[in-house]
Regions:
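Cysteine-centered catalytic environments shared across enzyme families
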Residues: 1-328, 340
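Adenosyl-5′-phosphate
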Residues: 1-4, 160, 190-196, 210, ...
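Short acidic/histidine-rich active-site segments
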Residues: 351-361, 365-367
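Phosphate/ATP-binding catalytic cores across multiple sugar-kinase/actin-like superfamilies
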Residues: 235-256, 346-350, 426-434, 552, ...
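ATP-dependent adenylate-handling ligase core
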Residues: 289-344, 348-350, 369-379, 408-415, ...
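A generic structural signal for residues located within well-ordered alpha-helices
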Residues: 63, 94-96, 168, 237, ...
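A conserved active-site-flanking secondary-structure segment within enzyme catalytic domains
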Residues: 89-93, 287, 378-387, 501
Length: 583
């Protein structure tokens, strides 16, 4: 797992160097660069497969085709064997090398052959191809600057090129105030775009003008396109998950697992126990030792014989982590993600690779909104009305999204749209981008077996009622049945199935509420009213976090200044000499 950067249209050596250096945390093991006539590409490497000879960029059989990739390709051995039979010559043991040979063989359709998570760039003479995996597990951002295209794994790398000026996109900010993220592929910075999941981007120069085309290569299957009897579907799902976890254990380094005590992480830990002979490290975080997540995780770890590590997050550490968390997240994200950020640093002390249960809620229907259509949309409607009344409308894409979910329609129609929308945007923007940001900030690769495309497509081909029983209010019905049929005699595993979903990350809810109260106490009464962006926010704490985001990304181009602390920033915003917190 790695970080990639590049410039197409002009191979600016200085800008490429600054961009690549800014991603050192994503790849502390090695660095490589390629400079062609029109394309410059950089790579920072975290060595996991092909440790001894997997340096990038990697050249294909043709001398003008190069690839840089941030990837884990789980079927690379089979692909490599097939490509060798077709006459291709491999120079490394890296999984990334199959991409450049697939491109030489199949062109842009090379992505259709890949099982895994990836974001990559192929330089092909005077043409560039960018690609992102089907569900956006790996990030890829780009910006058009004149006749050049900049791309990178992180926004801060684009800013460090010094070729574009960071400016807030107020329409994207309005979207974020309503939905929690910009609607569509845009970001909070004007002109900076995230390549959508399941898409490629091609770029060429025509008469010194940049010409780009974004193309979708993956769509979700229709519900009930390959239905099975419910019991058979549950049994097939268990075997599919077993095969998927086996493929995700591929590495030349030790692999851990996050363990929250909930259903998703429990399944992964249980399958790892079946498939892995050696010791397994499991990691849990909570705000105190008696937190329900910690207690349940301890039970499971003891039953499965895991080497269990528990991190306790204090309020003082919570507050102190906010600046580095936002620097990694590259968005004024909800502070609930701080627990994961801290946990990733702890995991990164021990291992380079970890399995995580992200994606199971979106694939199998794990949120309250899957059984109650107003669970989430009620607040969105209220926020949208407030913003429009103040002359700050959301984007057309944001309005279409909300209209599609609030329309008067039978519940199955609503549910079908919800699954599709959540897989398209919420999963990527609210979860996967933050998971990647926090893990890679700790030089840690997080793997998400529930988002293997075989698992996702299997689930989506089954009837909606298999995943969610909206009449009885049962979420993740198929996934729960798979666990009960397979491990129904294991008490603590059954406990994870029957346990009421209390919502992640519960481990920091108390700290977050305490931080909100602290902001209300120390920030001026007119803090929201007097700020040019105050109308976008409901609470002082939210505006404070946004202003911190501006400090880091607009003023400092994604680089957190040395010695910068959250308490100093709060004191500055509060116009007070100093602040301190306990606990």
């Amino acid at each position: 797992m790695c970080g990639i950067t590049g410039i197409f249209g002009t191979a600016d050596r200085s800008a490429l160097g600054a961009m690549t250096d800014s991603l050192r945390h994503r790849g502390p093991d090695d660095e490589g660069r390629y400079l062609g006539k029109l394309t410059g590409m950089g790579h920072r490497r975290l060595s996991i497969i092909g440790i001894d000879n997997g340096a990038q960029p990697i050249r294909g059989d043709r001398r003008d085709v190069y690839v840089v990739a941030n990837c884990e390709i789980y079927n690379y051995r089979q692909l490599r064997d097939d490509l060798r039979r077709q006459g291709h010559h491999f120079r490394t043991d890296s999984d990334a090398e199959v991409i450049v040979h697939l491109y030489e063989e199949y062109g842009d359709r090379c992505v259709e052959h890949l099982q895994g998570m990836f974001a990559f760039a192929v330089a092909d003479g005077d043409r560039l191809l960018l690609a992102r995996d089907r569900f956006g597990i790996k990030p890829l951002h780009y910006a058009e600057v004149g006749a050049s295209l900049l791309f990178a794994s992180e926004v801060k790398a684009l800013l460090q090129s010094r070729l574009l000026t960071p400016q807030i996109d107020e329409e994207a900010l309005a979207d974020t105030a309503v939905f929690g993220h910009p609607a569509g592929p845009g970001t909070l910075l004007r002109g900076v775009v995230s390549l959508p999941p399941g898409h490629t981007l091609s770029a060429v120069l025509a008469d010194d003008r940049l010409v780009t085309a974004v193309t979708r290569y993956h769509t979700l299957p229709e519900a009930e396109s390959d239905p099975k009897p419910f019991a058979e579907a549950a049994a097939d799902l268990t075997e599919l998950l077993r095969a998927t976890v086996r493929s995700h254990l591929m590495a030349e380094v030790e692999i851990g697992v996050t363990l929250s005590g909930g259903l998703d992480s429990t399944i992964l830990a249980r399958l790892m126990r079946d498939l892995h002979d050696g010791p397994i490290r499991a990691y849990t975080i909570g705000d105190h030792a008696d937190h329900p997540d910690v207690v349940q995780a301890r039970r499971l770890a003891a039953q499965l014989g895991l080497n269990h590590h528990v991190s306790i997050l204090t309020f003082q550490d919570f507050v102190a982590t906010i600046p580095s968390y936002l620097t990694a997240a590259e968005q004024p994200a909800g502070l609930g993600g701080i627990a994961l950020n801290v946990l990733c640093r702890r995991i990164g002390d021990d291992v380079k690779v970890c399995l995580n249960g992200e994606g199971a809620d979106e694939v199998f229907g794990g949120y309250g909104e899957y059984v109650n259509r107003s669970f989430r949309t009620r607040r969105m409607v209220d926020r949208l009305a407030a913003l429009e009344a103040s002359g700050r409308p959301v984007s057309r894409r944001g309005r279409e999204y909300l209209d599609s979910l609030t329309a008067d329609q039978p519940f199955p129609h609503y549910l079908r749209k919800l699954f599709a929308e959540n897989m398209r945007e919420q999963l990527t923007r609210d979860h996967l981008e933050l998971l990647d940001a926090s893990s890679m900030a700790a030089s840690l690769e997080m793997r998400v077996p529930f988002l293997d495309h075989h698992v996702v497509e299997f689930a989506f081909r089954q009837p909606l009622a298999y995943r969610v029983d909206w009449e009885l209010g049962i979420t993740k019905r198929l996934l729960k049945q798979a666990v009960l049929k397979t491990w129904g005699d294991e008490v603590d595993l059954v406990g994870s199935v029957l346990r009421r979903k209390i919502g992640a990350p519960t481990s920091v809810l108390g700290h977050r509420e305490r931080f909100i109260r602290l902001c209300d106490q120390v920030l001026p009464a007119d803090y929201l009213r007097d700020d040019e962006y105050g109308a976008y926010f409901e609470q002082k704490s939210d505006l404070l976090v946004f202003n911190l985001y501006q400090e880091i990304f607009v003023r400092c181009r994604g680089v957190l200044p040395d010695g910068f602390t959250m308490l100093d920033f709060m004191a500055q915003q509060a116009r007070r000499p100093a602040l301190s917190v306990a606990g």
